[in-house]
Design a protein with these regions (language model features):
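Small/polar residue-rich beta-strand/coil "junction" motifs that cap repeat-based extracellular fibers
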Residues: 3-7, 12-23, 28-40, 44-55, ...
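Beta-stranded membrane pore/translocator domains
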Residues: 283-387
């Protein structure tokens, strides 16, 4: 059925419909619909629908749909959909979807989706998705995703993800992720990650987390606002203005997790961390400390012995004082005895002495003393001769 000046509907065994001046719906065994000035819906064994001025939905064995001024959805064995002025969705064996003015979703055997003004999702054998004005996701055999104004996720055989205004995740055979306005994660055959506004990860398998963080060297990581990795295999945390807290370091579980000799963490003026042994810094090792403790034990034993001897010596002075009181014999006496007490520096001693007249000119004397503060028992004997 054709309705409109120069409208045409044609095809054997078909129910094609053309509505509008110059509209054309054609194809055998089909039910194509063209609605709008010079709209075109064409293809055998198809149910293509073109709605809008100069719209085009065509392809054999297809269900392509084009809606909008100059919208185009075409391809054999396809289910492509284009919605919006100058929207474009095409590819054989595909189900590409383009939604928005000047949006583009193309590629054979694909399921690419482009949503927004001037968006592009393209690539054969792909599942690329572009969402946001001027977003771009492309690459053959890929699953790239770009979300945000001017976001870009591109590369063949890749699964790159860009999320944020002017974010970029690109590279062949890659799994790069860029999240944040102006974030960039790029490189072929790598898995780089950039998270944060202006974050940049371009070194092989590098990661940058934080606004303005940068990891441009292989296997490097930068974490924190403005953190920058400056060499390969480096892990950078923050900047010189940051402080660091690791609460679990002091836990019993952390201590239990350690094995073997422990070491000290050291740093230089630039904050580069390393570890070293205690002996390397001039500190005593556990073996050294054990040796010192053994020596101290010996010294303490000697000091204890010396202290005991000193105590005896002090008490000995008190014993000497006590012994100094020897008895003397009167002319009529043959035996005399005396008892004395001596003290010195808070120590005490007791003594007992005796004198014996042996003959008219000879006297013998002797005594015993006992120090009560560790001095022990002492004694003396003596003889006096006079004429």
């Amino acid at each position: 059925m054709a309705s409109g000046n120069n409208a045409q509907a044609s095809g054997d065994n078909s129910n094609n419909i053309a509505t509008g001046a110059g509209a054309n719906a054609g194809g055998n065994n089909s039910g194509n619909l063209a609605s709008g000035l010079t709209a075109l819906a064409n293809g055998d064994n198809s149910r293509n629908v073109a709605t809008g001025r100069s719209s085009n939905a065509s392809g054999n064995n297809s269900r392509n749909v084009a809606t909008g001024f100059v919208a185009r959805a075409y391809g054999d064995n396809s289910f492509n959909t284009a919605t919006g002025t100058n929207a474009n969705a095409y590819g054989n064996g595909s189900a590409n979807i383009a939604t928005g003015p000047n949006s583009n979703a193309t590629g054979d055997n694909s399921f690419n989706i482009a949503t927004g003004v001037n968006t592009n999702a393209s690539g054969s054998g792909s599942n690329n998705v572009a969402t946001g004005n001027a977003a771009n996701a492309f690459g053959a055999n890929s699953s790239n995703a770009a979300a945000g104004y001017l976001a870009n996720a591109s590369g063949a055989n890749s699964a790159n993800i860009a999320n944020g205004t002017q974010s970029n995740a690109s590279g062949t055979g890659s799994f790069n992720i860029a999240v944040g306005n102006g974030a960039n994660a790029s490189g072929n055959g790598v898995a780089n990650t950039a998270v944060g506004n202006g974050a940049n990860a371009t070194g092989a398998n590098s990661s940058a987390y934080g606004n303005g963080a940068s990891a441009t060297f292989g296997n490097s990581t930068a974490i924190g606002n403005g953190a920058t990795a400056t060499r390969a295999n480096q892990q950078v945390y923050g900047t010189a203005s940051n402080t660091y807290t690791m609460t679990g370091v002091t836990s019993a579980a952390s201590t239990a997790a350690q094995s073997g000799p422990v070491q000290l963490v050291t740093t230089d003026a630039a904050g580069n961390l390393a570890s070293t042994s205690l002996s390397a810094l001039g500190f005593a090792s556990p073996a050294d400390i054990a040796g010192i403790n053994s020596q101290l034990a010996g010294i303490n034993a000697r000091l204890n012995d010396l202290d005991g001897r000193t105590g005896k010596a002090v008490n000995g002075v008190a014993m000497a004082f006590a012994m100094s009181g020897s008895p003397w014999l009167m002319p009529s006496e043959k035996i005399a005895m005396s008892m004395n007490w001596g003290t010195f520096q808070n120590t005490n001693a007791l003594s007992m002495s005796a004198a014996l007249r042996v003959s008219e000119h000879v006297q013998a004397s002797g005594g015993l003393t006992y120090g009560t503060n560790g001095g022990g028992l002492g004694g003396r004997v003596g003889m006096r001769v006079g004429w």
